[in-house]
């Protein structure tokens, strides 16, 4: 919905999200969040890497927390596909970022950087995750950002198998990226 007149609602499997218009010269950005404690060669690591690759192939800039685990895996996938990765790190040195980040923002604000990560994305994809990921999902929804959950927190909607409004579950990296891109138009 580049240069559109306003937000558009998209109905997706498992929920709906609202697409926001983007300024015409800005690349789309998707924040990818998840645990910093996973191994890169684990199943979640491989999923995150595929998410990064697919986003980069779609011309999307990846935003992440810039450290290890899911953040490093998604950055590696995007960088290997020639994409750009913005790592927003919690410390005050760009040197702490993983080697796949093409741009680093050193915040020096600890976990508060979680808000900066999700507010920098037009949509958010959560891959696995722990308590920090849950906080990022909460921030994203409070900001009105669509969230796609890939083996992550979906929270409870009204029915026993429903996710909370604005959180769309995805079964694969391909589905997660497709849902995020559909949400941002």
What do these predicted regions represent?
Residues 63-65, 87-88, 169:
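General beta-strand structural signal in soluble alpha/beta enzymes
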Residues 123-124, 170-185:
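A charged, well-structured terminal subsegment
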Residues 104-108, 166-176:
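Short acidic-hydrophobic, aromatic-tinged amphipathic segments that line or gate anion-handling sites
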Residues 59-62, 124, 165-166:
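Short active-site oxyanion
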Residues 46-56, 68-143, 151-162:
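Acidic/glycine-enriched connector segments
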Residues 26-41, 58:
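Generic N-terminal amphipathic, Lys/Arg-enriched alpha-helix
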Residues 1-16:
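N-terminal amphipathic/basic-hydrophobic helices that include classical n-h-c signal peptides
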């Amino acid at each position: 919905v580049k240069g559109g007149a306003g937000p558009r609602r998209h109905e997706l499997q498992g929920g709906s999200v609202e697409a926001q218009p983007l300024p015409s010269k800005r690349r789309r950005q998707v924040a990818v969040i998840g645990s910093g404690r996973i191994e890169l060669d684990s199943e979640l690591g491989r999923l995150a890497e595929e998410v990064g690759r697919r986003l980069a192939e779609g011309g999307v800039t990846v935003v992440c927390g810039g450290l290890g685990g899911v953040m490093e895996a998604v950055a590696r996938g995007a960088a290997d596909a020639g994409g750009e990765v913005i790592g927003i790190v919690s410390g005050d040195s760009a040197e702490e970022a993983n080697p796949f980040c093409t741009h680093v923002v050193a915040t020096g604000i600890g976990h508060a950087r979680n808000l900066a990560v999700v507010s920098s994305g037009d949509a958010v994809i959560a891959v696995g995750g722990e308590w920090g990921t849950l906080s990022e999902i909460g921030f994203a929804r409070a900001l009105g950002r669509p969230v796609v959950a890939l083996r992550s927190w979906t929270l409870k909607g009204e029915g026993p198998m429903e996710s909370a409004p604005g959180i769309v579950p995805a079964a694969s990296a391909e589905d997660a990226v497709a849902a995020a891109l559909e949400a941002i138009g």
